[in-house]
Amino acid sequence: MPVISLAQMLESGVHFGHQARRWNPKMDPYIFTERNGVHIIDLVQTAQLMDEAYHYVRSASESGKKFLFVGTKRQAAGIIAQEAARCGGYYVNQRWLGGMLTNWTTIKTRIERLKDLERRYESGIFDLLPKQEASMLRRELDKLQKYLGGLKQMHKIPDVVVIIDIRREYNAVQECQKLGLPIVSLLDTNCDPDWVDIPIPANDDAIRSIKLIIGKLADAIYEGRHGQVSAETFEGDDIPSAIDFEDETPEPVAEVADAEVAAAEPVAEAAPTAEAAPEEAPAEDAAPTAEAEEPAAE
């Protein structure tokens, strides 16, 4: 039995790719067809590759490997924090700071600074300081919590990195490749599959698609660590997040009718209405150049 059924993927909009003009030709093997100018991902292959990813992640978790989730886009940030916390992983969901992995020594000192400030704040020391000094320390604490809060328990470089939107997280991909860390990633139709080790062809823009795939990977980590899937589940749109989810202006993509998708996919029983992939921000079109920077330094 597959880890995720075709019906679940159709309902979550996993099959919706980008407009055909935005595609990466290397994704051609994973594309089923084109409908109204939009590429439709082959869900049969997605199901097979999801099974492979699930078993790989579960096996790695059983052997004690540590996982880092990376997803800084608005649709993914809350899901990343939620699922990483549930399965005992680490996460970056605000901004990837240059050198987060390749300059781990510096990052580790900033994490220790974060822990020290938290201890001082909780003990009430901030209240005893001059108002201006206390205000500066609170701002520093807030900044460190924002960018490094998901790494507080990470004592060494992780063994496996799970990434949402490898084009947006290009710097993270580069650092993983430099260190030889395996990458598990959702691949939309505009991605380059050569960048990752464990590909999962899927819509990486729709919240429900991201939640479905990342939730299953978190299940695999939890199962590998504890021998069973966590009973803690999150239904619907109950996604805690440190930031607001604002609707982005969608790409002018034509809707694909349910009956049409069902006819195009012979193995699917029905095709419920799914979310269309929103247009990427223009800044994401070009892969940014990796830069070395000291994180969260005042």
Swiss-Prot record:
One of its GO terms (biological process) is translation. The keyword Ribosomal protein applies. Residues 232-298 are annotated as: Disordered. It comes from the Bacteria. Signal peptide: none annotated. It comes from Acaryochloris marina (strain MBIC 11017). Keywords: Ribonucleoprotein, Ribosomal protein. The keyword Ribonucleoprotein applies. Residues 251-276 have a biased composition (Low complexity). Residues 234-250 have a biased composition (Acidic residues). This is Small ribosomal subunit protein uS2. One of its GO terms (cellular component) is cytosolic small ribosomal subunit. One of its GO terms (molecular function) is structural constituent of ribosome. The gene is rpsB. Belongs to the universal ribosomal protein uS2 family.
